[in-house]
Amino acid sequence: MKREILLERIDKLKQLMPWYVLEYYQSKLAVPYSFTTLYEYLKEYDRFFSWVLESGISNADKISDIPLSVLENMSKKDMESFILYLRERPLLNANTTKQGVSQTTINRTLSALSSLYKYLTEEVENDQGEPYFYRNVMKKVSTKKKKETLAARAENIKQKLFLGDETEGFLTYIDQEHPQQLSNRALSSFNKNKERDLAIIALLLASGVRLSEAVNLDLRDLNLKMMVIDVTRKGCKRDSVNVAAFAKPYLENYLAIRNQRYKTEKTDTALFLTLYRGVPNRIDASSVEKMVAKYSEDFKVRVTPHKLRHTLATRLYDATKSQVLVSHQLGHASTQVTDLYTHIVSDEQKNALDSL
């Protein structure tokens, strides 16, 4: 997400928050926490405080009016009710057949709340040099962390990767086979964004960039001749990322129709666009997630854009056997994160031997 857009969204959330959350924000900004982290925390607080109002724990008219005493007097039972609410609420994503958010999402929410409670009960000082209150209910709330070995994780992930010929096969399917299954109306809709969709998916498969890094690319960030993109990594760090050659024709096809198809002006700097009511806008992450889910489910198995990142990393490690190279490609500071791909490749090698 572009810094200016991120700051705009942070400001909107800050306008909703109680004064003690705003103090927390300023304190963590001085650490410094990244704007991305603080934005994610503010979204979690918005979700929590909205539930506080809906459940009647506070009779305040709006989130900004919720008094500090509500957090001070929050019981363990109240917090467990919030966790149950998260587990049972309908999912707001492309897969609507499941109920409740994942344990990973719940842990992220509780982590944000734990950070806020620690600040209020230990870190902040009032005029007397004391914290605002001492009772930290979050210390009584248990979180369940998913435990699995790298080998187990590799086994779970590898079925959702497009390895070997499946990378090009996936792109060919979208380009040639998927349209044959569509009604005339659906085909018309597909053709409007066919080149863009293929370019995005090809880029994800050929570079391994994160979804946020891809959707925030500007036209000037793509060097088609050198097959390099300039991205903004986590922590707002700029990085140059090599792109595999197989993505080039898909990017060229998209660029050939981009200006006319999406009615661009000079001010439309985003690389990947969507057209809404005749006005071009930067495509958002949610749209790409739904697009990848739709195409991948029809092709083989429903996956997320992050699985396309795993696909590139696994293929690159298989070709080079270099964790350092894979780490650099993914933008990781350590090779520890790439240990997963050694296990996936080992399984692939075993399967190859078994087939001899």
Swiss-Prot record:
Main location per the UniProt record: cytoplasm
Disulphide bridges: none
GO CC annotation, single: cytoplasm
Organism whose genome encodes this protein: Streptococcus pneumoniae serotype 4 (strain ATCC BAA-334 / TIGR4)
GO MF term set: DNA binding; tyrosine-based site-specific recombinase activity
Taxonomic superkingdom: Bacteria
HAMAP family hit by this protein: Recomb_XerS (MF_01816)
Name of this chain's protein: Tyrosine recombinase XerS
Lineage: Bacteria, Bacillati, Bacillota, Bacilli, Lactobacillales
Modes of activity regulation: FtsK is required for recombination.
Keyword set, alphabetical order: Cell cycle, Cell division, Chromosome partition, Cytoplasm, DNA integration, DNA recombination, DNA-binding
